[in-house]
Regions:
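A conserved regulatory-domain signal marking ACT and ACT-like small-molecule sensing domains
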Residues: 1-252
């Protein structure tokens, strides 16, 4: 489908602050703009919407987050020199839990309701994925949404979503604490094709299944089974030649 556009908000200040994604989703919902896909990283939230709504949504988001779109600012590229490797580090996070919601009604406002309730309970959400595939359930288009939270927040998050499910009639709500998030990071991957393919191939070689994928310009993260965490970390280190003793500092 070429009649789509991606709108995104970004900023290091959103790390650990509940409600940023919910505010973006609510801005779209209030304008009756439907979200077709969602993808996030720690510092960025992206939504795919209808191309015809793009300019209007940019204006609304600029008002919601007090960003001046008319200001002329020089943006300096931070791409690393070409002789630097595209991936500078690999990180494994085993303190995550995955919450999945099946068959969320594909109407404006659903994502806003879900993540506003989580924010009201002071639950910070890390990765968010909304499937592109649309399921028709009882003549109602639906999509699946999955997200990760800290393990300490998993039970409360499940309870919040289960209560909401009674109101909006989603499908199954499930939680899984036995996961790990594996990430590769590096500013050199910008404009460097093949990084994701190498990352995924290294996991496939070890027969490790990927449950979720999130990306940004400088980071690719996969959610995998917790029992595969160390094996996956070692495989990705080897694939990108990061097994040496040299210490590399990765900017936040």
């Amino acid at each position: 489908d070429r009649q789509i556009a991606k709108v995104a908000i970004s900023g290091a200040g959103m790390i650990g602050r509940p409600g940023i994604a919910a505010k973006m989703f609510k801005t779209l919902a209030d304008a009756r703009i439907n979200i077709q896909m969602i993808s996030t990283s720690e510092v960025k939230v992206s939504c795919v919407i209808d191309e015809s709504e793009c300019d209007r949504e940019l204006h609304l988001l600029s008002l919601a987050f007090d960003v001046d779109l008319d200001s002329q600012k020089e943006i300096t590229s931070r791409q690393e020199p070409k002789n630097h490797p595209p991936v500078r580090g690999v990180a494994l996070d085993t303190n995550q839990a995955r919450i999945a919601i099946r068959h969320v009604p594909d109407t404006p406002g659903m994502a806003a309701q879900i993540f506003t309730l989580l924010a009201q309970k002071n639950i910070s959400v890390d990765a968010i994925i909304q499937s592109q595939r649309c399921h028709i359930i009882n003549d109602q288009p639906t999509r699946d949404i999955a997200f990760t939270v800290a393990q300490a927040d998993a039970e409360l998050a499940c309870a919040v979503i289960t209560e909401l499910d009674r109101q909006i009639n989603c499908g199954q709500v499930s939680g899984d604490k036995a996961i790990a998030k594996l990430s590769v990071v590096g500013a050199g991957m910008i404009g460097h094709p093949g990084v994701a393919a190498k990352f995924f191939a290294s996991l496939a070689k070890e027969n490790i299944n990927i449950q979720m994928i999130t990306t940004s310009e400088i980071k690719i993260s996969c959610v995998i089974d917790e029992t595969d965490g160390i094996k996956a970390l070692q495989a990705v280190h080897e694939a990108f030649g990061l097994g040496g003793s040299e210490q590399i500092i990765i900017p936040a």
